[in-house]
Amino acid sequence: MADMSVKQLADLVRTTPERLLEQLKEAGVAITHVDQTISDEEKRKLLLHLKTSHSTETDKKRSKIVLKRKKLSVVKSGKKSVNVEIRSKRTYTKPVVEQKRETEPAPTQEVPLTSDTTNLNEKAEVNVATLEKAVEAEVKEEAKKTPSEKKETPKKGPRKETRRSRKPDKEDKWEREELHMTKLVEERRRRHKPAHMPDSDNASAKLEQGFARPTAPVVREVALPESITVADLAQKMSVKAAEVIKAMMKLGAMVTINQRIDQETAAIVVEEMGHKPKLIKEDVLEENLVATLGEQTGEAVPRAPVVTIMGHVDHGKTSLLDYIRRTKVTSTEAGGITQHIGAYHVETELGMITFLDTPGHEAFTAMRARGAKCTDIVVLVVAADDGIMPQTVEAIQHARAAKVPVVVAVNKIDKPEADPERIKTELSTHDVLPEEWGGDTMFQPISAKTGEGIDALLERILLQAEVLELKAVDNGPARGMVVESRLDRGRGPVATVLVTSGELHLGDILLVGREYGRVRAMIGDDGRPCESAGPSMPVEVLGLSGTPVAGEEAIVVPDERKAREIARFRQGKYREVRLAKKQTAHLERIFDRMGEGKQNTLNIVLKADVQGSLEALTEALNKLSTDEVKVNIIASGVGGITESDVNLAIASDAVVIGFNVRADAPTRVLVEREGVDLRYYSIIYDLIDEVKKALSGLLAPEFEEKIVGLAEVRDVFRSSKIGAIAGCMVVEGVVRRHLPIRVLRDNVVIYEGLLESLRRYKEDVAEVRQGTECGIGVKNYNDVKVGDQIEVYEKTQVHRTIA
């Protein structure tokens, strides 16, 4: 601060110059005139003097505090009134503190302001409690009659003691009530403290609890179940639900706050918002089940190999198995092709083998993949006269994916056009090399018709099984896999189960995916009932709650209640995931709906005999959809056609298709009465061809233009009635009346219209051939000039089909 005069300093501190000069003199500063300049050092000296003098005076004054209280109150009892005066006096002395030297800086220490107040309140309460003992009993009775007055005047003055006031029970009761009211009053005073007087006790706490803005974005690890609502997801990320909805709109999905989304979508949203997703599988019940069952304890014994026969359609897979079983399995299949997975247990002279016969048609891809999943060895059947086909290559891929060895059976070698060497060469292009060429694949030429080479093929299969050392525990709870399932009328759900380990008995509680039930009956592959089934044995199981999905694992559970809980848990989880994936408000679907007005749809109600065929048909029919026509399977199921299926078809204008199933008598009556299109099929080729024809009929018509004639304008005649008439020479083809035309000028189309009039020698004619003159009148067009060309064409409709 710059030096200033004494007068200026006096004006600054708001005092008189004379008073300031006196204080400077007391402080020992040599300044005698108001115009003299005072330095910073002299100011500090003056300030130190003032502090010392003021602190000494206040210490003397404030070292002792005397509090005096005087309260007047009137207590009424009937007609009498008593004046009560309460006087209290308290003296508080400040403790002596040693003064430190002036050279040392005095530490600043906060003294809580509420400590003295608290002591005062406590002492005042004690004083009031002692004074209450002198109040008369008449006052107590009046206070009982008027409790509201008691609340207003809770503290009573001292009175002369009477007999009634000496009673201990009433005295204690009055003392407790008044003491309680005193505390309430004190608490109310504290609670309603003015806003400009902050509580010193909480001052430091409020400073410490202030909100600190984060310096960096907070990255959280968000646990995501298999399905979650948008609101729960927002809560886990500590953001508003509107932010999550906005992020999903940027990703192309429109959702609501209560809509469920699947785990994959939630993980994408969490990553988009800068957090880390943690995927959680809600399979605690299943893990507990596996833990209770544990590993099967028992000695593993050799088991029969499970062999899957794969190959292209009509290459002789079922005929080969037919020869081995000595039965005509092929004759029972419609059209001579396999449309189910057949599981057969065969006892040969060399040992036992379980065969799985898979379909070869392209629609049964899922069945072949399922067959390769639960097999030990794959026998690839290739026709020697046909060679490698698409399903042959697909079977090789399934075998490699399942990591199972392949044995190639070259069939139909009894035909004169058979060429086994060509088969080896073609398979070598797919990395299937025979042993004689340095590979690891066994090749065996066979004939399913004559039986040639089949014994050698069985030897190779069992040799491969010995190399694999196939073993399984043959006792304890059974485990297996569902090969096929269907809904049988009269028997209910039927599942073909291939036992992989343990032993399955009648009465066991079987858990299969989302279905469960007690095994009511077991039927072997020969059609005979059996009571137990060991490893590598296929059996048909009756008694499940529904038709399980083919490919599900079957496991025996000791407790039916636990099986029911797990099945219901899986059903609920499946439903939640399915609903979460069904995004009805997805942006892409909105755009699809905008174009659906131009797309024709064929609605189908599909019923099949087994689950595998239903899957294959659904996939094959959905592949037929194009940009113009669409197959919409509104309902599908396993079992016969019922009235509910027909009613659904009536409501949705659909075609009912039954594959190897029929409708009962009441349903047929309903079909005839309502005129529903009901079709039966037993061969998948016929079904797909018929649906293709139906879709072809829904295609928009396509027209092809064909130029039939060309005329050149030589002259133009104008008439007030007719308009412009072009005198033309037909230079090419034939000109016919009422056909569409184009007017060309310098080879540029300037008008398209209709040929309205055609004359020759003032007579109307139907057509004019090449080299003939004629007059042509064009409808609603009069700007014809010499040198123009009139092109006459016709439109023909082209029959369109689905490729």
UniProtKB/Swiss-Prot annotation:
Composition bias type Basic and acidic residues, residue spans: 138-155, 168-178
Region spans: G3: 357-360
Record domain tr-type G: where: 302-471
CC annotations in GO: cytosol
UniProt source species: Coxiella burnetii (strain Dugway 5J108-111)
Xref: HAMAP family: IF_2_B
Keywords of the record: Cytoplasm, GTP-binding, Initiation factor, Nucleotide-binding, Protein biosynthesis
Primary site of residence: cytoplasm
Protein name: Translation initiation factor IF-2
Binding site for GTP: 311-318, 357-361, 411-414
Stretches for region G1: 311-318
Annotated segments matching region G4: 411-414
